Amino acid sequence: MFLLSLLIKIITIILPLLVAVAYMTLAERKVMAAIQRRKGPNIVGVFGLLQPLADGLKLFVKETILPSSANIIIFILAPILTFLLALVSWCVIPLGEGMVYSDINIGVLYILAISSLGVYGIITSGWASNSKYAFLGALRSAAQMVSYEVSIGLILINVLLCSGSLNFTEIVLAQQSIWFVIPLFPIFIMFYISILAETNRAPFDLPEAEAELVAGYNVEYSAMGFALFFLGEYANMILMCSLTTILFFGGWLPPFNLTILYWISPTVWFGLKTTFLLFGFIWIRSSFPRYRYDQLMRLGWKILLPLSLAWVFLISGILLSFNWLP
């Protein structure tokens, strides 16, 4: 019975996530088409709603080509590792009060640890491919993710100081009177920029810069290997936006403390906020040119890192001065 309940819990996390990832790709193509005054995918199904299924089926039935010079075992394991790590993080994300697989007291630390492991899948795929383009993309990715994780860690300290807990549910409940995005708005902007870089999204998509690296670390992958990298990237995007919703936008809490707003399911509020942040990802991708690699590193180490550290001192000072520590 325990194994059955465990399996049901895992399926209830994974299936909605996979559907969300599939339709996130469609939403991205539709929104970018609207911004660029195109139609976007509209052939498969009504308004192109079956396009993700067609894409998934196409990748599933394609032949997996293994490069003759590649390290085959690591080459196959790398995309699986990337995808699994993107899924494991979801077990501590609360979609509503009590709607979480594992409500651990060190949820923030757990997410940081898992996200830092994600770089291994990418760097091993670049190395195992035995291709200079793939390896260069993997090295860029490793440096980029490590650089911005430092800033993310320091930014999270500010939220932890205001909430007094590493537990995601308690962080959300600490925002019942006011969402943290209002007093910590500059920190939210820094965090949003950092998660764009952490998820390798435009304008920080240096590891897979199509124009210069022919798709980057996954250049040698086809069929399901490519699909797993793709799914992992989009699952990470949704995860980071969900994390931002929890840390700054009050998680599943409605925007105003009105009884009528509590009639709406908490999952709906959570989904709306996450969708809004995901739209920001797509909008930024459509609007901004790609950074040069030296600009990316300078932004991470010389601007975001000192600023996030300064904010830790400032927030600590304010909370201690006014005796506001939770």
Swiss-Prot record:
Mode of membrane association: Multi-pass membrane protein
Keyword check for NAD: yes
Keywords, comma-separated and alphabetical: Electron transport, Membrane, Mitochondrion, Mitochondrion inner membrane, NAD, Respiratory chain, Translocase, Transmembrane, Transmembrane helix, Transport, Ubiquinone
GO biological process, one term: aerobic respiration
A GO term for molecular function: NADH dehydrogenase (ubiquinone) activity
EC numbers on record: 7.1.1.2
Top EC class for this record: translocase
UniProt GO cellular component terms: mitochondrial inner membrane
UniProt function note: Core subunit of the mitochondrial membrane respiratory chain NADH dehydrogenase (Complex I) that is believed to belong to the minimal assembly required for catalysis. Complex I functions in the transfer of electrons from NADH to the respiratory chain. The immediate electron acceptor for the enzyme is believed to be ubiquinone.
Family: Belongs to the complex I subunit 1 family.
The protein's name in its UniProt record: NADH-ubiquinone oxidoreductase chain 1
Annotated source species: Chondrus crispus (Carrageen Irish moss)
